[in-house]
């Protein structure tokens, strides 16, 4: 895929940068792998906002993605590469030789007609899924399980990848996109290669309206609010807020670490950079 720019026929087009999706399927999603998706507007079951700046946006259907890749040693053919509104990566529709169809995250370099398989001792090629113990050192991987059989949980965003660094007994060391080096059990599964749609990060929406189409509401600065709404609100003219940057609830922000210690910290060999 390539990047597309536009002539400045309007202020919104002037800075817009989008991705050419010539290789994506023109048809709709596979109906058997689609379910409804209701919007929350950022509210919980009490109707209170628990996640700000969420609301509106185009109606979506959820595509059921196979993160477990538990259909072992059965060849599948890539039938289509499709757009998925629920994630940054594109998805690939697989058709297995027994007739079943499943969606997976589309890896970089995989195209329509390619063969993909999951198993314990399959070839090391993009899209194939196998246990970390059977993947050679230095291999680029994505879609990694954190618990055996639970399904992939990390390295799933567009263009991301991790690298297998070492093997120590029952564990392997993997360097994640954040720079963190972490232990995973050797039987946890991962997919070979990098997640596709690398150009996603180069996009520029060009106007506020396109952000609203994605279900994002305005992110208002605290210093632009009144004192009743934010600790940094109020003041005469354009004041600086009068204190160190903080959240609406008074917690320091812009670099202040809020992560609590947890039992899984023992698997972190090197903290993220």
Swiss-Prot record:
Gene3D superfamilies recorded: 2.30.30.30, Nucleic acid-binding proteins (2.40.50.140), Ribosomal protein L2, domain 3 (4.10.950.10)
Biased composition regions of type Basic and acidic residues, renumbered to the chain: 262-273
SMART domains from the UniProt entry: Ribosomal_L2 (SM01383), Ribosomal_L2_C (SM01382)
GO cellular component labels: large ribosomal subunit
GO annotation, biological process: cytoplasmic translation
GO molecular function: rRNA binding; structural constituent of ribosome; transferase activity
A Pfam family it matches: Ribosomal_L2_C
Keyword tags: Ribonucleoprotein, Ribosomal protein, RNA-binding, rRNA-binding
Region of interest (Disordered), residue spans: 222-273
Xref: InterPro entries: NA-bd_OB-fold (IPR012340), Rib_uL2_dom2 (IPR014722), Ribosomal_uL2 (IPR002171), Ribosomal_uL2_bac/org-type (IPR005880), Ribosomal_uL2_C (IPR022669), Ribosomal_uL2_CS (IPR022671), Ribosomal_uL2_dom3 (IPR014726), Ribosomal_uL2_RNA-bd_dom (IPR022666)
Oligomer status and interactors: Part of the 50S ribosomal subunit. Forms a bridge to the 30S subunit in the 70S ribosome.
Family indicated by similarity: Belongs to the universal ribosomal protein uL2 family.
Function: One of the primary rRNA binding proteins. Required for association of the 30S and 50S subunits to form the 70S ribosome, for tRNA binding and peptide bond formation. It has been suggested to have peptidyltransferase activity; this is somewhat controversial. Makes several contacts with the 16S rRNA in the 70S ribosome.
NCBIfam families: rplB_bact (TIGR01171)
Name of this protein: Large ribosomal subunit protein uL2
Species this protein is from: Desulfotalea psychrophila (strain LSv54 / DSM 12343)
Gene that encodes it: rplB
């Amino acid at each position: 895929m390539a990047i597309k720019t536009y002539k400045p026929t309007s202020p919104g087009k002037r800075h817009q940068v989008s991705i050419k999706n010539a290789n994506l399927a023109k048809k709709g999603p596979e109906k058997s792998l689609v379910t409804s998706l209701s919007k929350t507007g950022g509210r919980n079951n009490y109707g209170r906002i628990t996640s700000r700046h969420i609301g509106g946006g185009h109606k979506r259907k959820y595509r059921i993605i196979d993160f477990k890749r538990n259909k072992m040693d059965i060849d599948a053919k890539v039938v289509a590469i499709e757009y998925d509104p629920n994630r940054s990566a594109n998805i690939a529709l697989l058709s297995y030789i027994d007739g079943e169809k499943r969606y997976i995250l589309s890896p970089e370099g995989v195209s329509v007609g390619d063969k993909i398989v999951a198993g314990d001792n399959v070839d090391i090629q993009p899209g194939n899924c196998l246990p970390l113990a059977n993947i050679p050192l230095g291999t680029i991987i994505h879609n990694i399980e954190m618990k055996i059989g639970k399904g992939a949980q990390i390295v799933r965003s567009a263009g991301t990848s991790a690298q297998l660094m070492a093997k120590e007994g029952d564990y392997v060391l993997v360097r994640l996109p954040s720079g963190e080096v972490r232990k995973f059990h050797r039987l946890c599964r991962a997919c070979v290669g990098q997640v596709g749609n690398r150009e996603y990060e180069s996009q520029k929406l060009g106007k506020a309206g396109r952000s609203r189409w994605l279900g994002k509401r305005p992110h208002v600065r605290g210093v632009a609010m009144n004192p009743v709404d934010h600790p940094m609100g109020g003041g005469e003219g354009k004041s600086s807020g009068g204190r160190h940057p903080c959240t609406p609830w008074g917690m320091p922000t812009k670099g202040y670490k809020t992560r609590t210690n947890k039992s899984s910290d023992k698997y972190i060999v090197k903290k993220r950079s």
